[in-house]
């Protein structure tokens, strides 16, 4: 759990005790535990000196910060990678060992001057507490051959149908590579694929297709999704050797008032559901930490007339934690789920009238001790969403009608899911980082539901 003695830290979005953080790394589930590693600069609040930090949790909401586990060396700073459980007992290690594939960023430090980025291996035999670096089979200790000066960000998973481990990697520009291995020692490249606007931090996973008309039941259909850092996703097929894109790229996140906040999402290895965490590019408040992790999301696909659309939802354990509270407020953070019963303009109460009220379809107010910290207003005609804090108002384009929405607000961080999870928006209000919510109000045309 985040430290309580730092008033500028969120309650439920993980941040380290101190320093800069970015990409989630090595997400793996084992023995009822979620391990969360992450890019960390323990020396300051700006990007530098990349190490792997480590946190652990059991409910996808509360995390224990366990410090740094993978330090820079002569091969470079420790850039992004992944983790898997050694289920097949390979590499002379026990089945319960955790295996980590990571990027050593050559020429990123004085010690690694003149070296390229290389993909390397580490392991843990104590449940992920201690990571031990291990040379790969190539002459210089690499796991796979370097193809470009800064190729990076390996993601590894087992593909049952073809009986091999798959490694995906960003190579350069919009190019990604796919490798296969049966023993995690010898890897064979099977595809170099170009993805429109794709850049770094790849992931490749299979998702169930959910019926949009039958209460969210699975249809029995499955599709593969290739994921890249900006939240661009590409739906297609994968046979264990090659990925074939079948529809145009889409983006999983909506543009906020000034930025698409989520970046470099990664899925957990191990759990039955496909669970993803992204880095939220939040600002430093109070001089202690920069950046935080999103609340995890469970992924599936919905198929409609436009094709396959990513569906995101907050995990059941997250919702249950809020449901067990008296009023849906947990450690100063809140969760609510609304349905828009009447998409018509409403007449606001006189004391909360604002400059846009005559055009508003609905509004939500987050309060602390009778003070409105944040007001959300949806404009009827333009489908803009306005965010008001005191006399400051920002807005962003929704691009669609929101028939229903879920929100989690946590000390200045707002995550919104809409339209059964096909809409996702995250916004940072750093000036509210020290503020806890104790009550929520809404316009009459919004109805809470579970």
Where do the model's predicted regions map?
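Beta-rich carbohydrate-recognition and catalytic domains
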Residues: 1-154, 158-201, 206-259, 278-325, ...
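Beta-rich accessory regions
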Residues: 239-258, 266-450
């Amino acid at each position: 759990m985040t430290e309580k003695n730092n008033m500028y830290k969120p309650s439920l979005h993980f941040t380290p005790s101190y320093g800069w953080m970015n990409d989630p790394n090595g997400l793996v589930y084992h023995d009822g535990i979620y391990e969360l590693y992450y890019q960390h600069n323990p020396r300051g609040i700006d990007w530098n000196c990349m190490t792997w930090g480590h946190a652990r949790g059991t409910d996808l909401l509360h995390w224990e910060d366990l410090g740094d586990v993978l330090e820079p060396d002569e091969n470079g700073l420790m850039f992004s990678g992944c983790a898997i459980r050694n289920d097949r007992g390979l590499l002379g290690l026990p089945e319960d060992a955790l295996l980590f594939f990571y990027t050593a960023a050559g020429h990123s430090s004085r010690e690694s001057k003149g070296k390229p980025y290389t993909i390397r291996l580490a392991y843990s035999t104590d449940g992920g507490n201690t990571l031990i670096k291990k040379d790969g089979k190539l002459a210089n200790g690499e796991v796979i051959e370097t193809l470009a000066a800064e190729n990076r960000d390996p993601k590894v998973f087992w593909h049952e149908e073809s009986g091999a481990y798959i490694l995906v990697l960003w190579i350069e520009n919009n190019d990604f590579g796919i490798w296969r291995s049966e023993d995690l020692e010898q890897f064979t490249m099977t595809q170099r694929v170009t993805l429109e606007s794709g850049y770094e931090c790849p992931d490749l996973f299979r998702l169930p297709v959910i019926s949009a008309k039958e209460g969210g039941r699975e249809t029995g259909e499955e599709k593969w999704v290739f994921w890249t850092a900006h939240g661009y996703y590409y739906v297609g097929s994968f046979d264990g050797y090659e990925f074939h894109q079948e529809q145009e790229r889409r983006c999983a996140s909506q543009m906020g008032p000034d930025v698409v906040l989520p970046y470099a999402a990664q899925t957990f290895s191990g759990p039955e559901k496909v669970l993803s965490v992204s880095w939220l590019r939040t600002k430093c408040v109070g001089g202690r930490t920069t950046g935080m992790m999103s609340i995890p999301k469970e992924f599936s696909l919905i198929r409609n007339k436009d094709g396959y659309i990513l569906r995101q939802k907050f995990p059941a354990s997250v919702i249950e934690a809020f449901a067990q509270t008296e009023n849906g407020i947990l450690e100063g953070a809140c969760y609510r789920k609304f349905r828009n019963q009447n998409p018509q303009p409403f007449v606001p109460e006189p004391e909360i009238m604002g400059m846009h009220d005559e055009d508003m379809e609905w509004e939500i107010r987050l309060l602390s001790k009778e003070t409105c910290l944040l007001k959300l207003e949806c404009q009827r005609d333009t489908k803009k969403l306005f965010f008001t804090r005191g006399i400051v108002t920002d807005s962003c384009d929704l691009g669609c009608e929101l028939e229903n929405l879920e929100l989690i607000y946590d000390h200045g961080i707002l995550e919104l899911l809409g339209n059964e999870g096909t809409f996702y928006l995250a916004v940072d209000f750093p000036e509210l980082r020290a503020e806890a919510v104790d009550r929520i109000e809404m316009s009459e045309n919004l109805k809470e539901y579970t």
